[in-house]
Amino acid sequence: MTDLDSSLPPSVRTAGDSWTITELVGATALGVAAARAAETAGPDPLIRDEFAGLLVSSAGPAWARLADPEQSWLDDDPHGKRAHRVGIDYQAVRTHYFDEYFDGALRAGIRQVVILAAGLDSRAYRLNWPAGTTVYEIDQPKVLEYKTETLQRHGATPAAVRRPVPVDLRDDWPAALTAAGFQAARPTAWLAEGLLPYLPSDAQDRLFEMVTALSAAGSQVAVEVFGMNSRSNAQRWLRMRERLGLDVNVAALTYHEPDRSDAAAWLTGHGWRVHSVDNRDEMARLGRPVPEDLSDEAVRSTLLRAHLGGSTG
């Protein structure tokens, strides 16, 4: 169960809704990619995602400005610039955590990867995948189409066998995944990054049930668990809308339901061995601590990884 912020706006989501890359949930993928692009272009980056800038700038000039590592669109708002920088730091740390997760999974011999709600995730292109690795990317058809076409247009090629699976995670995605060549008998490395609040609580449970059912012994899963901070979301939304004309109200795009399962508890109760870390601790460990005066505005999340049928290492 999750404590809810009563000041959050009502969700605008509807059953069966869909989107392009600049609409609804698709636009949040652009926002995350903009943070990765800004981090990559900045000094001493934690991550390197040379594809993020291409994916963001191709969506329009306002998105390209959002990816500016100097955040020049906030030059006259020092507080907003610092708060936005903390958001970039969080995305960089989150990306770094899950990059390390995949590195560990590959060292364990896993060669089958599934990225749930892949959005503009470019790991199939930018990570060093061993020969024989297949990366399945599940997301809305138009989102996957945008990524594929944009990167092809710029001459980018995947570093692994990449298999897009255009299906909504609220639908029968296991059938679509299997049709794309997924083999449940092989250990799999799953990723659910920036996903859970965009699913209804019952769909989240079904997602974990299906992931578990499709996972052979030795499989791993990594998950980001985060809630919505009404104050920080409102301020971020207003800054982007007023200065860039980008209307991306994340709180209105997520489901705020009191019966949502605790991801770590659910996985533990279904045979997974879970290791988790608070994002603030991970940010401090990597040299990107949240300034004390911005603590109330910064994201709070838990980053976790889990193994099925073995220790977490």
Curated annotation (Swiss-Prot):
Its EC number is 2.1.1.-. Keywords: Methyltransferase, S-adenosyl-L-methionine, Transferase. InterPro entries: Ppm1/Ppm2/Tcmp (IPR007213), SAM-dependent_MTases_sf (IPR029063), SAM_mthyl_Trfase_ML2640-like (IPR011610). It is an enzyme of class 2 (transferase). Gene3D superfamilies: Vaccinia Virus protein VP39 (3.40.50.150). Exhibits S-adenosyl-L-methionine-dependent methyltransferase activity. Belongs to the UPF0677 family. This is Putative S-adenosyl-L-methionine-dependent methyltransferase MAV_5150.
